[in-house]
Regions:
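Eukaryotic intrinsically disordered, low-complexity regulatory linkers and tails enriched in Ser/Thr/Pro
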Residues: 1-13, 17-63
Length: 63
């Protein structure tokens, strides 16, 4: 789960396991596996970094 910011400047939490693709248009367009799309203010690099940080946190807890 990662915190992202909509174009309307509202923060929301996205389940990053459902991301199918990221595009810059110039905002970042996130397409989920169910076809739903989100436009966010973060760059693709920022979204990827947030996902990496989240995954490292989850996998380092030893579940």
């Amino acid at each position: 789960m990662v915190y992202l910011t909509t174009i309307g400047n509202k923060e929301f939490i996205l389940n990053c396991d459902h991301i199918e693709k990221l595009e810059e248009v110039p905002e970042t367009l996130i397409t989920l596996t169910n076809g739903k799309k989100y436009l966010v203010l973060e760059s693709t690099e920022e979204v990827i970094e947030k996902i990496i940080v989240f995954k490292k946190k989850i996998y380092s807890q030893g579940y």
